Amino acid sequence: MSFKKVSFAAVAAVCLFLGGCTQPRTTQIELPKSALDSVNLPNEVAIDGEKFILKQKNARTAEFYLPNEKVGFKWSKLVSVTVDENADINEYQKTFVTALKSGQFGKAEYDFKSINDKEYQAYTIYYPIAGNPDFDNYEINLINVKSLNCGLRVTHYALKFLNIADRSKFHALIKQKMPIFLAQMPQVECK
């Protein structure tokens, strides 16, 4: 046997061994579908005269930050949109209230107002958590929750205040900002 025949046979054997078989195969990998894929999600939103840019997104939640702020916990204002394809609006509210009452998120004040059987608005005021640098400020969340054909959409407009802020003014601020938020929140609807 000549060197060329041996080399060809060796290369052919290695190719068959590494390839697994002589027939070409196609493998399709299906990536998990993102709940956000079912909605029209903007790249930026404007609320109360400020522009927020989409900077972070996972399968369920998109976070919009002010242009000069980084992803993470050190934001001053934040807009987020979460879509849960399987959530029931009533169960979602019950679970949220249970978590708030349990102190899971620290001390919090909250209120929920039903708009109809498919939508409600809410606010939360989270108190600073001593010793936790990520949660060492007051945080107010203005929230709209709405059942859509493609899932439950939860929109938050969050504002942080120093832990020395006069919280006696928070309820007046919520009353002032809630109509602005509801009128200007991103109109994320099913595709």
Labelled PLM ranges:
Residues 1-10:
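Bacterial N-terminal signal peptides that target proteins for export
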Residues 13-14:
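Repetitive helical segments and hydrophobic/amphipathic motifs
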Residues 18-20:
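C-terminal motif of bacterial Sec signal peptides marking the signal peptidase cleavage site
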Residues 25-63:
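N-terminal "mature-domain start" segment
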Residues 48-87:
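Secretory pathway targeting signatures of secreted, lumenal, and periplasmic proteins
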Residues 75-115:
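Mid-chain, structured segments of secreted extracytoplasmic proteins
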Residues 104-146:
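Signature of long, low-cysteine stretches enriched in small and polar/charged residues
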Residues 151-191:
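Surface-exposed amphipathic alpha-helical segments
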